[in-house]
């Protein structure tokens, strides 16, 4: 039995489905802010509007979509409008004009009660400042969202315990915020957000105040949690390395406008203007880009219970010289060349794949950097298999693709 190629990005059933749709969004601060949108003033610059009318443009005609199950990163310098944008999405800051649709709900058209129900039932936010209540222990802080929903104590504690376990705080339930490190306090904030089982998770520079090592650990936790829960996430940051590591797509903002939207490799390798290029000009691409950014579908994947004749036919049909062998759960078993397939008898593909993989590259995780990947890829004639944390095949990296990426980087 042969298998269809596996998409290397995300696990959403409908990866192109727009969960959030933002169109022509404006936020202007000041008296009678709609003046900035008139035909007379639309072409005037931000500085001119501020000096002549006393209006400050926070967001200027912003449009984008966020797909269901996607981690969408909004990145920019201080004052670029990224934090204003994330607050406008749920009208914590009231937009001046534009349209915001979240999973079919018209946010701009919602009345006070509808907006409150939407925020309380479908969205959670995590800020850079943890916002923990000092007189409440970890359990009561993390279960706060469920408590204000009126969830009974036993039920909310059980749900919250699952999230505390997920973020690595098992055993700290009775501790108070003053007894926790910054990283642990932020884990409480993340558990509090996840406990309400939100459809949409808004994270506004949640790791910016943490030490570099703790920050990386928290990024690892978020990646792991997203693999399990597959939430729709809007993540705000000013750090390119963080944006590339976490984001399925990245929007770079400048002066309240979106300068470029693209996948991480597009932002790093193909900036659309000088402003975006400035973010990446001093970056060692191979230290930021990871396997998931360059991996492709394996041209030939066969099941370990396939008959050799069928496996050989699949390899030849794909125009390949080897096949990636997986079991019924798509767990990676090994690599088989055409010669090894010909030598295998019925029921022997798995054993031959395991032996044949001794000379093939070891499987790597999607978040391994190209810097770490290069020596592995160069040491073998075979492509490097990329597997998730359950050992399931996600894609491959061949030397040609890797070389092309590096040459573009240089």
Language model features by range: what are they?
Residues 37-48, 105-106, 143, 147, ...:
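Conserved ABC ATPase "signature" region
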Residues 301-321, 325-329, 342-345, 362-410:
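The conserved cystathionine-beta-synthase
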Residues 195-199:
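A short, proline-enriched helix->beta-strand linker immediately N-terminal to the Walker B motif
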Residues 98-106:
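Conserved ABC transporter NBD signature motif
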Residues 176-180, 184:
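Conserved ABC ATPase signature
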Residues 261-262, 270, 335, 396:
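ABC ATPase "signature
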């Amino acid at each position: 039995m042969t298998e269809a190629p596996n998409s290397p990005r995300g696990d959403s059933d409908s990866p192109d489905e727009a969960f959030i749709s933002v169109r022509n969004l404006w936020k202007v601060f000041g008296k009678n802010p709609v003046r900035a949108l008139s035909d007379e003033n639309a072409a005037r610059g931000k500085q001119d509007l501020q000096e002549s009318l006393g209006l400050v443009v926070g967001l200027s005609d912003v449009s984008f979509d966020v797909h269901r199950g996607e981690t969408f990163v909004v990145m920019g310098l201080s004052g670029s409008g990224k934090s204003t944008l994330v607050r406008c999405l749920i009208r914590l800051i009231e937009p001046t004009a534009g349209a915001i649709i979240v999973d079919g709900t018209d946010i701009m058209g919602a009345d006070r009660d509808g907006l409150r129900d939407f925020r309380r039932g479908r969205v959670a936010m995590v800020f850079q400042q943890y916002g923990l209540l000092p007189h409440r222990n970890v359990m009561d802080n993390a279960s706060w969202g469920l408590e204000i929903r009126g969830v009974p104590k036993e039920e909310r504690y059980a749900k919250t315990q699952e999230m505390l376990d997920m973020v690595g705080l098992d055993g700290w339930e009775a501790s108070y915020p003053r007894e926790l490190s910054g990283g642990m306090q932020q884990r409480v904030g993340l558990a509090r957000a996840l406990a309400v089982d939100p459809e949409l998770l808004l994270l506004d520079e949640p790791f910016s105040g943490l030490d570099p090592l703790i920050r990386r650990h928290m990024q690892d936790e978020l990646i792991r949690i997203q693999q399990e829960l597959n939430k729709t996430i809007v993540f705000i940051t000013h750090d390119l390395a963080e944006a590339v590591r976490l984001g399925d797509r990245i929007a770079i903002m400048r002066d309240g406008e979106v300068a470029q939207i693209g996948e991480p490799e597009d932002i790093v390798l193909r900036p659309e203007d000088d402003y975006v290029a400035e973010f990446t000009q001093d970056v060692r691409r191979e230290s930021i880009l990871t396997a998931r950014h360059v991996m492709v579908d394996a041209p030939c994947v066969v099941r370990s219970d396939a008959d050799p004749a069928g496996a050989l036919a699949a390899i030849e049909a794909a125009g390949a010289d080897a096949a990636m062998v997986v079991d019924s759960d798509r767990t990676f078993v090994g690599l088989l060349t055409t010669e090894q397939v010909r030598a295998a008898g019925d029921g022997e593909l798995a054993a031959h794949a395991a032996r044949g993989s001794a000379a093939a590259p070891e499987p790597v995780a999607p978040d391994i950097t190209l810097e770490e990947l290069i020596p592995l890829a160069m040491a073998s004639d075979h492509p490097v298999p990329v597997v998730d944390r359950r050992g399931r095949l996600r894609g491959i990296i061949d030397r040609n693709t890797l070389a092309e990426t590096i040459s573009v980087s240089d």
